[in-house]
């Protein structure tokens, strides 16, 4: 709660520091070079460059992912048994330990899923291309590949952050292997859904006339 409060307190300042100038970046064909193994891989690289190229987008889209990694890392310094000992006598700790792990696993599953779902870069990826969106229409790739790459990148970084988070939870024994697998699979399934819905809305009602990347990020 303290970490969330601190980050929220300085969120506006962080956005101001990482905001780009009010001039949209121009995409070039170099970003989708045909030197990649396949056109789809090239599109994925282009999407990654787009997200990392706008610090404000990177921070806002990955806020939930970064928060989960930070919380999981901090949890490594506390054992489940020591936490249970705060609520029950020491002699009763072994008895309540399985229940504590079950509760902890449920909390990490649902809270983690909500945080990872907030990392929905696909929902603004079409509008983010701005006035250079015509460039994609000139490339020898299908619309399915273009939009598929946007969703693939969204799921890729969620997968990476989710796996790292579960490793941090597993090291001190807060969760079981089964819970860790659930904590990876469930967010990916829901992220796939919200990414498709978000991208569909963005394609249906794009905003190519934005002047500040913060405007499009806050959609």
Identify what each model region corresponds to.
Residues 1-134, 142-219:
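Hydrophobic alpha-helical transmembrane segments of membrane proteins
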């Amino acid at each position: 709660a303290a970490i969330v409060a601190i980050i929220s307190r300085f969120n506006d300042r962080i956005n101001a520091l990482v905001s780009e100038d009010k001039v949209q970046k121009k995409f070039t064909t170099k970003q989708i070079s045909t030197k990649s193994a396949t056109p789809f891989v090239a599109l994925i690289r282009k999407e990654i460059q787009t997200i990392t190229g706008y610090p404000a987008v990177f921070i806002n889209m990955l806020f939930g992912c970064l928060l989960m990694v930070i919380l999981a890392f901090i949890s490594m310094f506390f054992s489940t048994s020591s936490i249970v000992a705060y609520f029950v006598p020491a002699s009763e700790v072994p008895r309540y330990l399985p229940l504590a792990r079950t509760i902890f696993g449920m909390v990490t599953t649902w809270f983690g899923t909500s945080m990872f779902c907030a990392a929905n870069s696909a929902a603004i990826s079409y509008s983010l291309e701005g006035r250079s969106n015509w460039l994609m229409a000139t490339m020898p790739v299908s619309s399915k590949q273009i939009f598929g790459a946007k969703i693939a990148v969204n799921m890729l970084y969620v997968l990476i952050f989710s796996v790292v988070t579960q490793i941090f939870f597993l090291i001190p024994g807060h969760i079981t292997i089964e819970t860790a697998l659930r904590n990876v699979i469930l967010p990916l399934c829901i992220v796939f859904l919200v990414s498709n819905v978000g991208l569909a809305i963005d394609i249906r009602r794009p905003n190519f006339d934005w002047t500040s990347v913060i405007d499009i990020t806050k959609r």
